[in-house]
Amino acid sequence: MENITNVYIVEDESIVAKDIQNSLKKLGYNVLGISNNGADAIKNIVDLEPHIVLMDIMIKGPLTGIDVAEKIKKEYNIPVIFLTAYADESTLSKAKITEPYGYILKPFKEIDLHSTIEMAIYKHKKDTEIQKERDFLYSLVDNKDETAKDILFVKSNSRLVKVNLKDIFFD
């Protein structure tokens, strides 16, 4: 069975939000919801746990899309793609600090939306795998347990592979 990607949209213009929703459904994505402001977006994203968030930069309320994206990245590890009409240097400088998984200028083509989402989902998956591996390695370094001394790491295909020496050498 194919996994369906769950998407959350943060867009303050309802017509644009509906257009994005229709495009996503046509492309085979599941839209969990739409918010037009930062506070609602954060609450719903926490509750619904989407795979990815499409974020307008200029939204209603005191929080910008950049503020919301920064919070989502720091606290919830959900990838964000900006969908915006703004490409000035100031906006780009602020947006890139949040390390978005994409930046699409409006108006956009469905193929651009689709390819950016697919690349972002793949990159986020790989980033998560690398982080888990890194966390595991740090836990071994911090581990004062005797079992850690019997573990060897071998580089294989640009990845570290854990080998338990007790499985290789027999006493």
Regions found by a protein language model. Name each.
Residues M1-T5, D145-A148:
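Extreme N-terminus of proteins, especially the signal/transit-peptide cleavage junction
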Residues E2-I9, E13-G38, K43:
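Two-component/phosphorelay signaling modules centered on CheY-like receiver
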Residues N3, G28-V31, E49, N77, ...:
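Short loop/turn motifs at secondary-structure junctions
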Residues Y8, F82, F169-D171:
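Short, hydrophobic/aromatic-rich beta-strand segments within well-structured domains
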Residues S23-K26, N44, I72, K94, ...:
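A general structural signal for stabilizing positions within well-ordered secondary structure
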Residues V31, I52, G102, D167-F170:
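Residues at the N-termini of beta-strands
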Residues K43-D47, H51-F136:
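CheY-like receiver
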Residues K132-D171:
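Conserved binding/recognition cores within well-folded domains
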